[in-house]
Regions:
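Surface-exposed patches in mature extracellular/periplasmic domains of secreted proteins
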Residues: 82-94, 178, 208-220
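Extracytoplasmic/secreted proteins, especially bacterial periplasmic and envelope-associated proteins
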Residues: 69, 73, 160, 164, ...
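Long, well-structured alpha-helical subdomains associated
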Residues: 17-19, 186-190, 202-275, 290
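Active-site recognition of the HExxH zinc-binding catalytic motif
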Residues: 156-176
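A metal-dependent hydrolase signature that marks the N-terminal structural subdomain at the beginning
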Residues: 16-128
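Post-HEXXH active-site segment of zinc metalloproteases
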Residues: 171-195
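Bacterial N-terminal signal peptides
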Residues: 6-14
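Active-site scaffold of zinc-dependent metalloenzymes
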Residues: 101-158, 168
Length: 290
């Protein structure tokens, strides 16, 4: 019975490759794929992520339902000339262990010793055995895997998608990417890397003068960063304490920016997204990747 349940779960996570669902979002992009919506799996994933949702105080965190709007932000960022994300794959609420292992084997950006010693165990854990498609928010979550050069997104938040894309940008501009990934085991390096990723997200939102999303980003990325800082506090619940401080600072900054933008609105706001829209019927006609 356990074997049958395990096989059934694996098949449900993987979806059916021969009958792909309609692609929901911006549409086919060579660097983006989306998993098939599976209500029982996605619903259970939401339950597993409740604690993370509470800590970050946002129900869209790890909600396994990425909207067209969030994907549009990702598409626009990836296609910017200044975004160094060539070759990076963006996987939206998807369980595809075959693709993950294939990308691990073919990712020449990271030298083979790093991929064997660090990439294999990392990928087996986060992409095969304990996939974010089900366990995001409980064990893992939105993340960038430098060994497969893949961003996995499960939250319907543009700021989170841009943050993870910022990790790709940060890693891809490094000459020694494997070493940069290895350095994360040194205390404090993770804080630097998380800061650089969030900095890239905020840069995009401020450059495009997307004030609503910038204000929302302060409320999400600051407490998220606080969990990393709090993890270094030698007390029980350090990450939670860090998140609370992040909420205070982030919401204070958001309030300050909101007042500033109301008092001094930009003369000519810059559009962050393509002005064309796609009808739901047209979207349903576009085939999906798994």
């Amino acid at each position: 019975m356990r074997r049958i349940l395990a096989i059934s779960l694996a098949l449900a996570l993987a979806g059916c490759a021969t009958t792909p669902p309609p692609y929901i979002g911006q549409g086919p992009h060579p660097q983006i794929s989306r998993g098939q919506p599976i209500a029982p799996i996605d619903g259970l994933g939401n339950v597993f992520a409740i604690l993370t949702k509470i800590i970050l105080w946002n129900w869209k965190v790890e909600n396994h339902n990425i909207s067209a709007k969030t994907e549009e932000y990702l598409v626009h960022y990836v296609d910017l000339p200044e975004s160094i994300t060539d070759g990076t794959h963006y996987s939206l609420n998807e369980y595809n262990p075959g693709m993950a292992l294939s990308r691990l084997a073919k990712n020449k950006k990271v030298k083979w010793p790093y991929r064997i010693l660090l990439g294999i165990p990392t990928t087996l854990i986060v992409d095969v055995l304990i996939p974010g498609r089900l366990f995001a928010g409980l064990i893992n979550g939105d993340m960038y895997n430098p060994y497969t050069d893949t961003v996995s997104i499960y939250s319907d938040l543009p700021s989170v998608a841009l943050h993870e894309a910022g990790h790709s940008h940060d890693f891809n501009k490094r000459r020694y990417k494997g070493t940069y990934a290895l350095l994360r085991i040194i205390p404090g390096v993770d804080l630097f890397q998380e800061y650089k990723a969030s900095q890239q997200a905020f840069k995009y939102l401020t450059d495009t003068q997307d004030h609503p999303q910038e204000i929302e980003a302060y409320k999400v990325l600051y407490p998220a960063y606080g969990t990393y800082v709090g993890a270094y506090i030698p007390i029980i619940g350090g990450s939670l304490a860090g998140a609370l401080v992040g909420h205070i600072i982030g919401r204070s900054e958001a309030s300050s920016k909101e007042k500033e933008y109301k008092a001094f609105p930009p003369a000519a706001p810059i559009s962050t997204l393509p002005t064309t829209t796609t009808s739901p019927a047209a979207l349903e006609a576009v085939p999906a990747s798994q």
